Design a protein with these regions (language model features):
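Sec-dependent bacterial lipoprotein signal peptides
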Residues: 1-20
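Conserved, well-structured interaction surfaces
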Residues: 91-168, 202, 219-227, 385-392, ...
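Short, surface-exposed recognition loops and adjoining beta-strand edges that mediate ligand/DNA contacts
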Residues: 37-41, 65-87, 168-183, 224-307, ...
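Membrane-proximal, proline-rich intrinsically disordered regions
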Residues: 22-79, 321-322, 330-335, 343, ...
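Hydrophobic-face positions in mid-chain alpha helices that act as interaction patches
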Residues: 49, 71, 233, 257-397, ...
Length: 464
């Protein structure tokens, strides 16, 4: 993991959307125009720069050749290890299997990449939070832009620790969390040197105490401020979405319901309907997006981006090796007219292949196409087949409805859960009728649609 000056040297006037995209040191600038560690921590400009750097990491962090950049690529790779993905053909990503990932070592495997990514976020949030609390003056801390950035920093730290605990520790269990080994705990109380020294492994309970404290601080801070309408910033509704995920993981059903409802009510987003969901997931102004990122027009996105790696229509990308299909055990339960069927190509369903699909998918092998014919993923598309241009997704409104529905069902609120599930699925399948299932059967139905809706968005692996 590289130090602050390698990741977050902020040139004067640099904004979030003017940062290069395909290099790990994407915020490094010349020494004559950059801010050092102390300057970054001790000034308003530095705090804003650190938080902008965190956002840049979310879409531009370089995981290495062929992996794809940023959190969306890591989310997709995690879902490759879930039970909803099928592979029967040679594919460049075949090494990312559940058992294989447990045995891999080195700095070019998913274990290291996930650890490094989330802890790099944490290290820099610690520096930002420490500077806000201990270095800025009271008047500086009252500045609305500074308060907003501080709120985002707290939310980022909670998000990153929650991801780490799910990946590298036991799932939260209220009866054992106080003794279950969690992850290494680093906070803003450490000095810069201490942030990179060996530290003890905390418990799962300690991790979630910090996560929930950070989320509370972030929500209290952001709720009282004018919301940044850009979806490449964390807003009050986005933090409520993170809190809903955390509560669901902890089996705190009442809190999960509350936070999901709060996210929905304040998101300034709405569910996409029918063909709107076939937009290729490449435009962060899409109605349903809550959190995503847009590259600047001047940025050379090249071959390292998420869409260059995983879209189905970018010429000369890596995607013709992305031969992974949806599990037909769940896909075949979709309604005949469910628009989500078009996110997957099933050779036996007599579907039309999209006209602009990359030629690498098309060579025939024994009379069949060269992709994963059981249900090839075609969910992601670039805006123009000759360019890797396109926005990247972190959180959608639909997820909040599924969290709310599950939380309601877990509390025995079957009628409410049925209505919530109907509300979201009806936008995907015009023929969908109000569910009548109750109890475990209703929960299974909620999971079915959540699994299909959010596959490759980094949700299913954690739900397993």
């Amino acid at each position: 993991m590289k130090r602050l000056h390698k990741y977050l040297a902020i040139a004067a006037g640099v904004t979030l959307l003017t940062l290069p995209a395909c290099k790990k040191d994407f915020l490094e600038t010349s020494s004559t125009t950059s801010l050092g560690d102390k300057q970054a921590e001790g000034t308003q400009e530095g705090l804003l720069g650190i938080v902008n750097g965190l956002h840049s990491m979310m879409y531009a962090y370089n995981f290495g050749q062929g992996f794809g950049a940023g959190a969306p690529s890591l989310n997709l790779r995690l879902d490759l290890m879930s039970d909803d993905v099928i592979n029967t053909q040679p594919a460049s990503l075949r090494e990312y299997t559940y058992l294989g990932a447990h045995n891999e070592r080195g700095d070019d495997v998913i274990n290291f990449r996930a650890w490094d990514f989330y802890y790099t976020l944490i290290q820099h949030t610690n520096i930002a939070i420490r500077g806000f609390k201990n270095t800025l003056t009271e008047d500086q801390r009252k500045d609305k832009k500074i308060r907003y950035s501080a709120g985002e920093a707290y939310a980022f730290r909670a998000y990153a620790y929650h991801q780490l605990v799910q990946l590298f520790a036991k799932r939260y269990n209220a009866s054992t969390a106080a003794s279950d080994p969690g992850v290494v705990m680093r906070t803003d109380e450490a000095t810069n040197a201490q942030l990179y020294e060996k530290a003890r492994r905390g418990t799962v309970a300690e991790a979630y105490e910090l996560i929930e404290s950070d989320l509370k601080m972030a929500m209290e801070t952001l709720k009282d401020l004018d919301q940044n309408n850009s979806r490449n910033h964390l807003r009050y509704s986005t933090v409520c979405g993170i809190a809903a995920r955390v509560a669901l993981c902890k089996s705190d059903w009442a809190a999960a319901e509350t936070y999901a409802k709060e996210a929905i009510a304040n998101a300034n987003s709405k569910l996409q309907v029918g063909e709107e969901l076939l937009d290729g997931f490449n435009d962060y102004t899409a109605n349903e997006w809550m959190w995503g990122y847009r590259y600047a027009e001047t940025q050379n996105q090249g071959y390292g981006t998420f869409l260059a790696t995983y879209s189905t229509n970018f010429d000369n990308g890596w995607q013709d090796h992305f031969r992974f299909a949806v599990n037909r055990n769940i896909f075949d339960q979709l309604g005949t007219n469910d628009v989500r069927r078009k996110w997957w190509y099933c050779y036996d369903q007599d579907q039309n292949i999209p006209e602009d699909v990359d030629a690498g998918y098309l060579p025939l092998i024994s009379g069949t196409p060269g992709f994963e014919i059981t249900g090839q993923c075609m969910k992601y598309r670039v805006q123009n087949h000759a360019s890797s241009k396109g926005d990247v997704l972190i959180m959608r409104l639909g997820e909040m409805y599924y969290i709310q529905a599950e939380a309601e069902a877990r509390q025995g609120k079957d009628a409410a859960a049925q209505t919530t599930l109907y509300t979201v699925v009806k936008t995907r399948d015009a023929d969908f009728v109000q569910p009548t299932e109750t109890g475990d059967a209703l929960i299974e139905k909620i999971f079915l649609h959540k699994r299909l809706d959010l596959l490759f968005e980094g949700v299913r692996f954690f739900d397993m």
